[in-house]
Amino acid sequence: MIEIKKLCKSFGRIKAINNVSLSFRQGEIITLLGPNGAGKSTLMRLLTGFIYPDSGQITILNNNIEENRIEALSNIGYVPENSPLYPDMTVFEYLCFMSKLRNICDSIFEKRCQEIIKNFSLAEVINQKIETLSKGFRHRVAISAALLSEPKILILDEPTEGLDPNQKHELREFIKSYGQKNLVIVSTHIMEEVEALSTRVVLINKGKIIKDTTAHALKMLSPSGNLDEAFRNIIQNRSLL
């Protein structure tokens, strides 16, 4: 679904993404894991077209992102960690607005909206203004809006940030279900999430891919079988790669 070849992106002298090549397929849930400033968010912004690479190529569902930008990006739903919302709108008004931007017809929007309200427990806030909502509810609204067009590729940056334990569980179950027939890419620092969600774990540090593996294989690199310990060992000791 996504092919990345020799991708590079620098900001001044800092190589945020350095010669990255990856391939992602339908039915995968990819976790991007790395320390702060590793390049995870930059890679996500490149995949979603918010910034352009200095060199290299991104192909999404056989569409080169530079040559067929609209076609490529139409298949992606993206939720950054701090999603820009319209605080004066109600939740329903915002979902309507986003559906119009994506040219979703009214009948399909009505069906999708009902599903989303149920899946993300939004019934109690659907007519409230976004500015009155908690951070957790705002994040759920942002994810809901990204799902209106039923994208084949869903990209989530810190998706459970601000959610309570029950909300985290519900969202993780949804991600696992959605990832069975689509591609989901998640950036997170929560090891419990990495273990619960991932079919693949891609470790990034200093703009480079240092390991492409599974959560189980990653755990085995720790004497105690601890995922967080294994991650720290890899970042601190390249001899474990």
Show which residues each predicted segment covers.
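Helix-to-loop junction immediately C-terminal to a conserved catalytic motif
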Residues: 48
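Conserved ABC transporter NBD signature motif
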Residues: 56-67, 71-72
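Conserved ABC ATPase "signature" region
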Residues: 96, 100, 107-125
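Catalytic Walker B motif of ABC-type/P-loop ATPase nucleotide-binding domains
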Residues: 154-158
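Helical segment within the ABC ATPase nucleotide-binding domain
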Residues: 168-180
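ABC ATPase "signature
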Residues: 212-213
